[in-house]
C-alpha cells in the first residue's frame, strides 16, 4: 500500500514537470486604473473652531450613488481644545477667596496661585501681580480675568456675603 502511494505521488509530480506552460501576451484589463472613478458614497467633513459654549449637533447628508438614497449622519463638531486659565472663587460670609487654575484638556486642572482673600488683603492686587508674573498669559486674557475678579468682588460686597440675597 505504501509503495502504491509513493508511486502515485511521484507520477503526479512527474506529470506536473512534464507540462510546459506557454507564455502568451494578451490584452487584459489593468490591475490599477489610472483614471479616477466615482466614489460609492460622498462623505463631507466639517471642521470648525468654536467656543465650547457653541458646540452643537450637526446633520450631515451623504449621497450613495448605488441606490441614490440620501443618508443622514449626526456628528458633533468639537473645536480643538487648548489649555486655559480660569478664575476660581470661594464665596464665604465674611470674605471671598480668588485664585487661578490652568485647565489642561485631558489632564484636569493645575493650580497657578493660592487663594487670595478679600477684604483681609487686597486680593485684586495680589491676583494682578500673580498674572503679571506669568509671561505666557496674554495681556487680553489678563484683563478679562481681572475684570471677572472685579465683578465677583463687587457682587460679593453688594450682597453682604449672602449668596441668596438679590
Curated annotation (Swiss-Prot):
- The superkingdom listed in its UniProt entry is Eukaryota
- State whether it acts alone or in a complex, and with which partners, per the record: Part of the 30S ribosomal subunit.
Q: Where in the cell is it found?
A: Plastid, Chloroplast
> Does the record carry Plastid as a key word?
yes
Family the entry assigns: Belongs to the chloroplast-specific ribosomal protein cS23 family.
Its recorded name reads Small ribosomal subunit protein cS23z
Family annotation (Gene3D superfamilies): 3.30.390.140
Q: Which biological processes are named by the entry's GO terms?
A: plastid translation
Question: In UniProt terms, what function does this protein have?
Answer: Component of the chloroplast ribosome (chloro-ribosome), a dedicated translation machinery responsible for the synthesis of chloroplast genome-encoded proteins, including proteins of the transcription and translation machinery and components of the photosynthetic apparatus.
Natural source organism: Arabidopsis thaliana (Mouse-ear cress)
Q: What keywords tag this UniProt record?
A: Chloroplast, Plastid, Ribonucleoprotein, Ribosomal protein, Transit peptide
Indicate yes or no for the key word tRNA-binding. no
Which InterPro entries does the record cross-reference, listed alphabetically?
PSRP-3/Ycf65_sf, Ribosomal_PSRP3/Ycf65
Task: Give the GO molecular function terms.
Answer: structural constituent of ribosome
**Gene Ontology CC terms:** chloroplast; chloroplast stroma; chloroplast thylakoid membrane; mitochondrion; ribonucleoprotein complex; ribosome; thylakoid
